């Protein structure tokens, strides 16, 4: 017998055992069958709403990847334009490590042959779980509250210790905030720099 998706998802959520839960989702079935609550729509929106109500669901694993790339039922378009519109950090694994690395140091914009570039130094780390492996670059308007929970402010997630700034005429003021990520996606405090672009 075929199990009900919502029933399974709630069961998985209940017995997640304080571990990250990623629900496998068949792209083709999701767009092939109607939402039982809304027969005029396929199941994508209903599944997203359900996932958002379940506290242990950290994401979705899609299969087959080809179906996503082929944009069956406009699935990929809906994800790119709505649910996955902004960059995201990997889910944290606090049961392995929950200590954040130190923040980047010496953040400084410099003119180079390639344009205006924001540079920073990697923080020191003694053990594998203290070392910064990536950096998140956020951009905020001058005077705007620095909120690293707002993914719409992410302009880059990079292993590099620099970011090429989109210079225009030097009249617009921004604050760039850079954080360090370790291998478990623990995020450091913010290192800030005001720039004029």
Question: What are the residue ranges of the model-derived segments?
Answer:
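Beta-strand-rich modules
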Residues: 165-188
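Exposed beta-strand and adjacent loop surfaces of beta-rich binding modules
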Residues: 115, 132-136, 173-175
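Local beta-strand/beta-hairpin segments that build beta-sheet-rich folds
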Residues: 149-156
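Hydrophobic, well-ordered secondary-structure elements that form the walls
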Residues: 60, 120, 137, 178
């Amino acid at each position: 017998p075929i199990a009900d998706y919502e029933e399974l998802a709630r069961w998985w959520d209940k017995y997640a055992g304080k571990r990250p839960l990623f629900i496998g989702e068949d792209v083709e079935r999701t767009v092939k069958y109607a939402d039982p609550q809304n027969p005029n729509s396929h199941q994508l929106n209903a599944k997203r709403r359900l996932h958002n109500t379940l506290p242990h669901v950290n994401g979705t694993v899609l299969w087959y990847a080809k179906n996503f790339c082929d944009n069956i039922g406009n699935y990929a378009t809906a994800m790119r334009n709505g649910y996955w519109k902004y960059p995201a950090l990997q889910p944290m694994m606090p049961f392995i490590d929950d200590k954040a690395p130190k923040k980047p140091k010496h953040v400084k914009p410099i003119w180079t042959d390639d344009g205006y570039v924001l540079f920073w130094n990697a923080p020191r780390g003694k053990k594998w779980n203290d070392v910064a492996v990536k950096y998140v670059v956020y951009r905020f308007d001058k005077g705007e509250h620095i909120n690293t929970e707002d993914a719409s402010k992410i302009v880059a997630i990079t292993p590099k210790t620099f970011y090429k700034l989109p210079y225009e005429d030097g009249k617009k003021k921004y604050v760039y905030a850079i954080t360090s990520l370790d291998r478990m996606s623990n995020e450091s405090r913010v290192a800030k720099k005001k720039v004029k672009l």
